[in-house]
């Protein structure tokens, strides 16, 4: 018996572009979630003091709240940028290393917009961080570069 929630004929799909095939089903976009924005990104680090220093002193995030959770033997650090809550930084005892290369499924990188990529690179170089050479986005023509956080999470700087 067909599932009425996904019972859309192929002909209907091509006539009504509010539908798209997802996970082997055809879903009606009129019933999709109405997400508003990314609320925050949670990052687990292997060396809490080093990552805290990186995200605050190198990248310029502000500390909104920091707590040690005894039951989890873990720190939780809430970080904001320009008044917007963005990152939860967690420490856990002996977390497994993140696989960055070869690229694996899951989070690929996080990207931050900057006014000037070359100025951002100069600031990072002054702090002994050396991003990849600047590239140009083939679609937008904008400049971008990558470097890594202390646990090799790729971070992109994208010029707006």
What is each PLM-predicted segment?
Residues 37, 73-75, 106, 141:
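Exposed loop/turn and edge beta-strand positions of beta-sandwich/beta-sheet ligand-binding modules
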Residues 19, 26-34, 67, 78, ...:
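Vicinal oxygen chelate
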């Amino acid at each position: 018996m067909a599932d009425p929630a996904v019972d859309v004929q192929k002909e209907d799909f091509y006539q009504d572009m509010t539908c798209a095939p997802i996970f082997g089903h055809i879903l009606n976009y009129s019933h999709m979630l109405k997400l508003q924005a990314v609320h925050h990104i949670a990052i687990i680090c292997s060396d809490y003091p080093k990552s805290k220093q990186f995200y605050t002193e190198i990248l310029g995030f502000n500390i909104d709240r920091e707590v040690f959770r005894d039951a989890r033997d873990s720190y939780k650090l809430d970080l904001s940028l320009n008044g917007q809550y963005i990152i939860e930084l967690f420490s856990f005892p002996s977390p497994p290393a993140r696989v960055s290369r070869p690229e694996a499924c899951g989070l690929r990188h996080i990207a931050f917009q900057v006014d000037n990529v070359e100025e951002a690179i100069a600031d990072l170089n002054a702090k002994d961080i050396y991003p990849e050479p600047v590239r140009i986005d083939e679609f937008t023509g904008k400049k971008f570069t990558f470097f890594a956080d202390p646990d090799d999470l790729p971070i992109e700087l994208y010029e707006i």
